[in-house]
Amino acid sequence: MEPVHYSVQGNNILQIFMENFHKEDPVLFLDGTAGEGGHSLLFLKGFPNSKVILCDRDPVMLSRALARLVDFKERVVSIQTNFSEIDSNLLSSHGINDSPQGILLDLGISTFHLFHSGRGFSFKEAEPLDMRLTPNIGINAEDVINTYSKDRLMHIFYTYGEERWSKKIAEVIVERRKQNLISYTSELADLISKIIPRKLWPPGRHPATRIFQALRIEVNQELTHIEKGLDSLLNLLRPEGVIQVISFHSLEDRIVKNSLRNYAKQNGFELLTKKPILPSEEETKENPASRSAKLRVLRKTKSADKKYKKENSKEE
């Protein structure tokens, strides 16, 4: 089973951990978004005495990651869970009584999900409108498209997709589904491409891209999980530990940026990236999908005296 996902900013991430930990240290890493295990493989090779807690909400991805890391199975503990649910009680139930020193969250959708899962994340194939990252649990994209009100559809298209044609697209979907349910990615993509005039299509991008992003975020409640997960993981992180987070679009990055900056102000944390680290030109040539990846890093300098209290940040 060959991996199909590229480990975005892998060299940068490993280098940052190398700068904060000694190579021979028995570092405990937590990969909160395991994917196909590419980043964890770098940690296991780069730190020969380390262990990795491998987490993913998708059992298919977790299985693929474990297969890739089979040579290191004695140093890997796997947990099927959303990273937002990770806390000391969950780790303890899996025999882990220490807090992680290195945490990684890669918030991007994997290549496997887009092109090989058959769950309708991409409009390039005629697939069922599903989009669930945890299979068979919760509402799917077909439910959203065929049951949400016009106003609710318009809201998620505009809020999560930043789509200026949100109102018109929502209106057409509601009228169209009165005749037949919209069940396949190709149906939805074709419908959207007919609504937006071709001369106004975004350069180099299918006009349905923003709507598909909005649906995926809604189905999986991605932004809610990011907020909750950062709060939990930053409190779980061991003193002198480091958390690295990769975001791919402005909605994700805004949450990550503000959360990390607020922690750095209040709770004995040090922001190691005043500005996000971007992929190298070489990496973007090899993997064009990485071009929008922003890496932000925070180090815990001491234990927080009390649980973090959110405050809104208006800093850029």
UniProtKB/Swiss-Prot annotation:
One of its GO terms (molecular function) is rRNA (cytosine-N4-)-methyltransferase activity. It comes from the Bacteria. Residues 302-316 have a biased composition (Basic and acidic residues). InterPro entries: RsmH, SAM-dep_MeTrfase_MraW_recog, SAM-dependent_MTases_sf. Keywords: Cytoplasm, Methyltransferase, rRNA processing, S-adenosyl-L-methionine, Transferase. Transmembrane segments: none annotated. It holds the Pfam family Methyltransf_5. S-adenosyl-L-methionine binds at G37, G38, H39, D56, F83, D106, H113. Coiled coil: none annotated. GO terms for cellular component: cytoplasm. Its EC number is 2.1.1.199. Residues 276-316 are annotated as: Disordered. It is found in: Cytoplasm. It catalyses: cytidine(1402) in 16S rRNA + S-adenosyl-L-methionine = N(4)-methylcytidine(1402) in 16S rRNA + S-adenosyl-L-homocysteine + H(+). One of its GO terms (biological process) is rRNA base methylation. Specifically methylates the N4 position of cytidine in position 1402 (C1402) of 16S rRNA. Belongs to the methyltransferase superfamily. RsmH family. This is Ribosomal RNA small subunit methyltransferase H. The lineage of its organism: Bacteria, Pseudomonadati, Spirochaetota, Spirochaetia, Leptospirales.
